[in-house]
């Protein structure tokens, strides 16, 4: 919607007024292109401060007007993309068109559209999604343009609101780094940061800028860098769109001359993490669940990475040592990124032989056509160990969904390759048995000599 003004009779107080550029009716006829823009801004300021009204012209509407010069201002902007209203412009009727006059004038306001883009920074790449272990740090980058308003614009809002889901812990110690090119903005001078923990576990961070301090950097825009850690409250799933989101909103003034004229841009990134349970069963009767088996989970580099599990109450807790199968034959390992993992049975259930070789499983996260993770994933036994197989998922009471790796044990006794008796035990037993044989042999030899001696005497 536009308003346009013509009558100079209503604007006598505008001319020769130092508050509005000290223009005269004669001087405005000699203005060049840039000076005309400045004149339009000052004239608009006068109209606002003196509450002058103009004729309204809606988008696409055609009005008949007298010949002359008009100040055209955008009073609202419903443009797609949340555009900022264009600055006031001077329009003449008619306009020169080649060698003739054009009396059918079309006004095309030049709205500027702010840009907001949020990414995860991973290995020097900017991505919308990532796969992480619980405890890993997720680095964020937000880039946004800075809207440009006319010089007399006041009370400009430029504010970011970042919402982290409960599975993300904001790193307050590191905080925000706010830059524009080589310029580093100062907290509490150029912007303020307010952090609030919500009842549902979300963290809401508000970054409010002093527009006067950043407007000179409109050409390069603004960049926010900050980070969070994936925590034990993270959503763990292998289904689409179930992840740990971080949303960003940019609220900004759309038209500084219209009360409460604000627009909002949004963007988000998502981090996914996975987990699996181990169900320990008898090799002959799979319905027989085995308690007391102890397992470790390591990545392909041999590092122990599974550090969280469910306790008996269904709460996510830190895993101390190995995972131990409960009365249902299950132990869980939570918060794992995609990749290969080695499951090693450290202690077998009572009455069962120890699993000889580790079971390697590979978690593969699905991606869409753009290369972004979808949240869906698959798991497979990837080293051919037939003692392990993938069965139906485990659904936890908190909504998390885990893969399920069923591992069989054979009844019987086995000696572990490390720990327990082991080879040392065999050596000790062999030495003891050999000692007994030697003693018996000596006793036997002594007895024979005694008998022979007794017979000789007789």
Label the model's feature ranges:
Residues 1-458:
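Solvent-exposed loop/turn and edge beta-strand elements of beta-rich ligand-binding domains
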């Amino acid at each position: 919607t536009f308003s346009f003004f013509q009558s100079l009779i209503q604007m006598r107080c505008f001319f020769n007024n130092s508050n509005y550029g000290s223009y005269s009716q004669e001087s405005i006829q000699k203005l060049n292109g840039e000076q005309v823009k400045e004149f339009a801004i000052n004239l608009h300021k006068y109209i606002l401060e003196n509450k002058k009204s103009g004729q309204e012209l809606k988008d696409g509407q055609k009005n008949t007007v007298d010949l002359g010069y008009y100040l055209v201002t955008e009073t609202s902007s419903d443009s797609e993309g949340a555009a900022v209203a264009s600055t006031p412009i001077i329009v003449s009727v008619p306009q020169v068109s080649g060698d003739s006059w054009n009396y059918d004038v079309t006004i095309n306001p030049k709205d500027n559209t702010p840009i907001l883009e949020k990414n995860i920074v991973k290995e020097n790449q900017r991505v919308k999604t990532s796969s992480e272990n619980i405890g890993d740090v997720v680095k964020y980058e937000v880039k946004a343009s800075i809207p440009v308003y006319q010089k007399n614009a006041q009370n400009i809002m430029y504010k970011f609101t970042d919402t982290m889901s409960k599975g993300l812990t904001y790193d307050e110690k590191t905080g925000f780094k706010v830059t524009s090119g080589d310029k580093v903005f100062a907290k509490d001078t150029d912007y303020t940061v307010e952090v609030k923990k919500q009842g549902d576990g979300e963290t809401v961070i508000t970054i409010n800028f002093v527009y006067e301090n950043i407007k000179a950097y409109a050409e390069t825009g603004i960049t926010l860098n900050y980070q969070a850690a994936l925590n034990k409250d993270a959503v763990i799933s292998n289904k689409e769109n179930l992840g740990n989101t971080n949303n960003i909103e940019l609220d900004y003034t759309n038209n500084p001359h219209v009360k409460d004229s604000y627009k909002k841009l949004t963007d988000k990134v998502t981090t996914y993490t996975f987990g699996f349970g181990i169900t320990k069963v008898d090799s002959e009767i799979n319905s027989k669940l085995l308690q007391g088996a102890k397992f470790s989970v390591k990545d392909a580099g041999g590092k122990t990475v599974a550090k969280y599990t469910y306790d008996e109450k269904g709460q996510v807790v830190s895993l101390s040592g190995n995972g131990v199968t409960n009365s249902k034959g299950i132990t869980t390992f939570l918060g794992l990124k995609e990749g290969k993992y080695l499951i090693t049975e450290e202690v077998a259930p009572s009455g069962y032989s120890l699993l000889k070789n580790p079971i390697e499983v590979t978690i593969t996260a699905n991606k869409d056509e753009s290369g972004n993770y979808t949240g869906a994933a698959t798991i497979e036994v990837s080293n051919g160990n037939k003692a392990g197989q993938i069965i139906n998922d485990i659904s936890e009471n908190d909504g998390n969904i885990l893969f399920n790796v069923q591992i069989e044990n054979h009844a019987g006794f086995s000696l572990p390759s490390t720990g327990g008796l082991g080879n040392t035990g065999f050596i000790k037993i062999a030495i003891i048995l050999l000692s007994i044989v030697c003693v018996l042999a000596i006793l036997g030899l002594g007895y024979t000599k005694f008998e022979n001696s007794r017979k000789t005497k007789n």
